[in-house]
Amino acid sequence: MVTSQQSTAAAGSVPLELPYYGAPIGVAVKRFFTKYATFTGRASRSEYWWWALVNYAVLLVLGILALVAGGTPQVSVDGTVAPPAGGAIVVVLIITVYSLATIIPGLALTARRLHDGNFSAWFILIALIPGIGGLILFILTLLPSKPEGARFDQGSPQYS
């Protein structure tokens, strides 16, 4: 079933207020930063999962750089641990800045993804349940879009 919004996506750009179903990777990343702290509205699965892939790839590369730069602790024979090399400290600082810069938009994107499945953004807090919370949130973000999720859009009566 093709919705009017999906046919709009084929013809041109999708308004930021609407989810972009079938978003390409570049558009998904651009929308992630454009909607930096927007917790209202919805995000399609492609918007969410393309960003997740890019985010994990960036963190993987930075983590490898930290290890290559001397981030593994070196234990000597007498049991003392040498401090990490200066390069590793720089990379860890970059990882910290990157993580701080993407935590708010990451939470906003997750909230919008939950909205698209017709769940409240408060379901993000389920990730705080030890052990199973993260898995439950992961499954919720995998679920397909529901038309009822439109109630979270900015023009809906809930936000009027």
In which residue ranges do the predicted regions lie?
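Amphipathic alpha-helical interface surfaces
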Residues: L93-T96, L100-R113, A121, G134
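Short hydrophobic membrane-inserting alpha-helices and related fusion/pore-forming segments
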Residues: A127-G133
